[in-house]
């Protein structure tokens, strides 16, 4: 059982100072460096006249300096808010407005201003890291204090900041280190998801808590299949963490198999549905490896259920279950009145336990709608539809609302609609998902009533709309296809009939 995340990680700087903690394309950093960098930053933050316990935005990509900054912020007694370099400027601006952070630490150059918020620039940060200090980490984040805050999609175009406390994270990491997963000692783990995506917590903190090494794959590599396929066999990893969608890309490379990556023993998936096809293909490529399907919203700290996908499981299930609840967590399946439903009946998944967030940062209205207390434990309305069988095995069946998962990213269709409505060439629009036969979202399609325009073709109009949207929203939220209509169907009460459009896109 972990008492404190920071103390656990810092201990490795004493017991194995020269062990590599971070490797990005052959450039390595040690546990001693991690402690020295994070101590130096914490010492510097302590000298600044910053509001106590207010969070700090950390802007950057997949680098060692990002990890060191996270730990330095936490050592100073504050939560960090990770924002990836590939975020649109507007997202950085909105998060800064919502979070009201004590400061912004720019590990990479900021692409836009952040008003009056104090900023530590990349050059200043480098100088801080280079300053030796003798730091006493005596006021690190602990207990119910926020450890990190990750912003997810919001229905009005305003993202929601999910507050994850130190104890939330400990509950999660303790589970990851348990026999449920059987992770190797000092794991060599793939670190591929961006740090602003809570799936990254699945590789970062269990690995650091076990004194292992993170092997980072930057976005520049993962976006270029040639570079990616060349890099994969060079990684001496034994633990793989990614979305199923990223695995689907890697499986396009025939040489991605146990023969060329003989050290790989564990595959962990989260963020979206793991299809039977993906799991079966992976099992053929890596017959002796252990494959785990996990499930959980960001609001419950990464994941709360797991199941090992064995040959027997593949033979038994056409649509893979999401698994069993972790030992300290209770999951109920309820109807629209909040009453528990019989085993095997579909209902909303209610998640209660010590890894459930206290709510959304500076958003009491949304917090009150989604979070409550259940028998003395914090609980969360997941909005996910599922079933539970008599043995406590859970299956995922979809969303209560119009929220989808695509390529591991959670997207609220209403937020996409919000941005579409702001686009200058659009009169009316709605975004809907396209599912494949494995019930996985493969595409987001925008049904659009355009304003009168002079574009020579639909293609030219689409190009102009997409270009505008790139400055307003995350790339993964932009619809892949645009279908132009003279009008959209309406419900009897005058709202756009989204369900009928979804049926049109997904004929049975």
Curated annotation (Swiss-Prot):
It is an enzyme of class 6 (ligase). D-alanine binds at residues 198, 302, 495. SUPFAM superfamilies: Acetyl-CoA synthetase-like. It catalyses: holo-[D-alanyl-carrier protein] + D-alanine + ATP = D-alanyl-[D-alanyl-carrier protein] + AMP + diphosphate. It is found in: Cytoplasm. Pathway: Cell wall biogenesis; lipoteichoic acid biosynthesis. The keyword Nucleotide-binding applies. Its EC number is 6.2.1.54. ATP binds at residues 152-153, 293-298, 384, 396-399, 495. GO terms for biological process: lipoteichoic acid biosynthetic process. InterPro entries: AA_adenyl_dom, AMP-bd_C, AMP-bd_C_sf, AMP-binding_CS, AMP-dep_synth/lig_dom, ANL_N_sf, DltA, DltA-like. Gene3D superfamilies: 3.30.300.30, N-terminal domain of ligase-like. The keyword Cytoplasm applies. Keywords: ATP-binding, Cytoplasm, Ligase, Nucleotide-binding. GO terms for cellular component: cytoplasm. One of its GO terms (molecular function) is ATP binding. HAMAP family: DltA. Catalyzes the first step in the D-alanylation of lipoteichoic acid (LTA), the activation of D-alanine and its transfer onto the D-alanyl carrier protein (Dcp) DltC. In an ATP-dependent two-step reaction, forms a high energy D-alanyl-AMP intermediate, followed by transfer of the D-alanyl residue as a thiol ester to the phosphopantheinyl prosthetic group of the Dcp. D-alanylation of LTA plays an important role in modulating the properties of the cell wall in Gram-positive bacteria, influencing the net charge of the cell wall. Belongs to the ATP-dependent AMP-binding enzyme family. DltA subfamily. This is D-alanine--D-alanyl carrier protein ligase.
């Amino acid at each position: 059982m972990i008492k404190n995340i920071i103390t656990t990680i810092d201990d490795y700087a004493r017991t194995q100072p020269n062990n590599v903690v971070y490797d990005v394309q052959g450039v390595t950093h040690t546990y001693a460096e991690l402690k020295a960098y994070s101590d130096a930053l914490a010492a510097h933050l302590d000298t600044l006249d910053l509001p106590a316990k207010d969070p700090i935005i950390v802007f950057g990509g997949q680098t060692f300096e990002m990890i060191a900054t996270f730990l330095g912020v936490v050592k100073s007694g504050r939560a960090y808010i990770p924002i990836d370099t590939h975020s649109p400027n507007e997202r950085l601006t909105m998060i800064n407005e919502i979070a009201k952070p004590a400061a912004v630490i720019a590990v990479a150059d900021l692409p836009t201003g952040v008003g009056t918020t104090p900023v530590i620039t990349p050059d200043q940060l480098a100088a801080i890291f280079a300053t030796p200090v003798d730091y006493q980490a005596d006021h690190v984040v602990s207990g119910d204090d926020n450890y990190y805050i990750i912003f997810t999609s919001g229905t009005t175009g305003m993202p929601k900041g999910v507050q994850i406390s130190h104890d939330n994270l400990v509950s999660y990491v303790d589970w990851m280190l348990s026999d449920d997963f059987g992770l190797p000692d000092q794991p060599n783990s793939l670190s591929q998801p961006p740090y602003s995506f809570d799936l990254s917590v699945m590789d970062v903190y269990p690995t650091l808590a076990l004194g292992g090494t993170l092997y980072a794959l930057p976005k520049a590599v993962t976006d270029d299949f040639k570079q990616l396929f060349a890099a994969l066999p060079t990684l001496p990893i034994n633990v793989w963490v990614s979305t199923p969608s990223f695995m689907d890309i890697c499986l396009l490379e025939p040489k991605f198999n146990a023969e060329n990556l003989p050290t790989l023993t564990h595959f962990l998936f989260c963020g979206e549905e793991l299809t039977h096809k993906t799991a079966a293909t992976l099992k053929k490529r890596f017959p002796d490896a252990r494959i785990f399907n996990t499930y959980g919203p960001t609001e419950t700290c990464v994941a709360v259920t797991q199941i090992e996908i064995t040959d027997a499981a593949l033979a038994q299930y056409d649509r893979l279950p999401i698994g069993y609840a972790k030992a300290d967590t209770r999951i109920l399946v309820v109807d629209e009145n909040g009453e528990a439903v019989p085993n095997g009946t579909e209902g909303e998944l209610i998640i209660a336990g010590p890894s459930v967030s206290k709510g959304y940062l500076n958003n009491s209205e949304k917090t009150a709608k989604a979070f409550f207390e259940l028998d003395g434990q914090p609980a969360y309305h997941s909005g996910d539809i599922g079933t539970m069988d008599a043995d406590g095995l859970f299956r995922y069946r979809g969303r209560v609302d119009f929220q989808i998962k695509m390529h591991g990213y959670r997207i609220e269709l209403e937020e996409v609609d919000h941005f579409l409505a702001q686009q200058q060439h659009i009169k009316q629009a709605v975004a809907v998902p396209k599912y494949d036969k494995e019930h996985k979202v493969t595409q987001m399609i925008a049904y659009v009533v355009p304003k009168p325009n002079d574009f020579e073709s639909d293609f030219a109009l689409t190009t102009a709309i997409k270009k505008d949207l790139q400055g307003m929203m995350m790339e993964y939220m932009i619809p892949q296809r645009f279908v132009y209509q003279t009008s959209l169907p309406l419900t009897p009460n005058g709202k756009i009939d989204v369900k009928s459009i979804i049926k049109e896109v997904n004929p049975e």
